Amino acid sequence: MKKRKGLLIILDGLGDRPIKEFGGKTPLEYANTPNMDRLAKMGILGQQDPIKPGQPAGSDTAHLSIFGYDPYKVYRGRGFLEALGVGLDLNEDDLAFRVNFATIENGIITDRRAGRISTEEAHELAKAVQENVKLPVDFIFVGATGHRAVLVLRGMAKGYRVGENDPHEAGKPPQEFTWEDEESKKVAEILEEFVQKAHEVLDKHPINEKRRKEGKPPANYLLIRGAGTYPDIPMKFTEQWKVKAGAVIAVSLVKGVARAIGFDVYTPEGATGEYNTDVMAKAKKTVELLKDYDFVFLHFKPTDAAGHDNNPKLKAEMIEKADRMIGYILEHIDLEDVVIAITGDHSTPCEVMNHSGDPVPLLIAGGGVRPDHTESFGERECMRGGIGRIKGHDIVPIMMDLMNRSEKFGA
């Protein structure tokens, strides 16, 4: 029995809702995607709910579910996964947070992402905060990708029941940090002190002075959320399926998930996780990994960002960009030897500007696949596909079975 290789491609936030300016089509249906459509014709389509029907999923919990883990059991907050993703060496008693560089004016958050500042700017600003802010505990503050950053409070894991200051929409003041016990109260007080001192450093930083002169929103405030401790992973993905697994990822959160479950993670030069990401660099790295790894995970972020930005046209353009990436991969592999699955971690409809509970399009093609009669890759075609509507955690077992790597249950 020939064992095949597996390629899981996640186009972050892929699913959407009908767009009036597209004649009622979704961005995926509107986009020109000859490569994914070719796979749809030779493969099988369906829909998947990353958690359960109608439940909006975070990128962290969605990815954990898709890789076969029960997020209700293993998830311990986003922050720790972000920290793993930026390569920090953490201890089990550390407490980590996801942070946004944001813009504040007269006590009101005017932009939760500070105009989507560049990764280079974020890293320089984070360095200034780390060097100039003093706290009663040891801490690490580093930039991640784009407007994202990570904060780690050393030895404060017992205070994980702390809230956040992120109002989750512009036009509102920052929230006050809530707490549930004495340990989390200590953490809340430290976070308040950190945010205030960081604001003083950021507001007068040369990068923000330059941004103001250019008419760009300054990254002069920090929104902190997602308190997290070490995830409770019962068994590594690589151990469970007895495969060598590699991943091509630019975004720190998803890197953290992949590292936590045993993947070797690669970020080729030019892969930014932003609209300008070099898809050919990611495609070439994916083809390279498929030579040495049994299972490869390729992540693409810009589709999600366009949904959050309520930009249907840009989302369609990013889907087309992803299709070109997929086209390169198809030119350099033998589909008889590889099982490909393409989906999103969740839906990010432009009208919602956030994650929703809408089901996510799913495509599986390659060796061993019994094709259905679908013609293209889109939300409505997926509704009539042969896979039906499944849970996110069913995707990998289906792939592994087609790869001839599953074990029989029973005699």
UniProtKB/Swiss-Prot annotation:
InterPro entries, sorted: Alkaline_phosphatase_core_sf, ApgAM_prokaryotes, Metalloenzyme, Pglycerate_mutase_ApgM, Pglycerate_mutase_ApgM_sf
Listed GO MF terms: metal ion binding; phosphoglycerate mutase activity
Reactions catalysed, as given in the entry: (2R)-2-phosphoglycerate = (2R)-3-phosphoglycerate
UniProt keyword terms in alphabetical order: Glycolysis, Isomerase
Gene3D superfamilies with a match to the protein in the record: Alkaline Phosphatase, subunit A, Metalloenzyme domain
EC number in record: 5.4.2.12
Keyword Isomerase: yes
Pfam families xref list: Metalloenzyme, PhosphMutase
Pathway: Carbohydrate degradation; glycolysis; pyruvate from D-glyceraldehyde 3-phosphate: step 3/5
GO BP terms, alphabetized: glycolytic process
Function: Catalyzes the interconversion of 2-phosphoglycerate and 3-phosphoglycerate.
Family: Belongs to the BPG-independent phosphoglycerate mutase family. A-PGAM subfamily.
PANTHER family registered for this protein in UniProt: COFACTOR-INDEPENDENT PHOSPHOGLYCERATE MUTASE, METALLOENZYME DOMAIN-CONTAINING PROTEIN
This protein's name: 2,3-bisphosphoglycerate-independent phosphoglycerate mutase
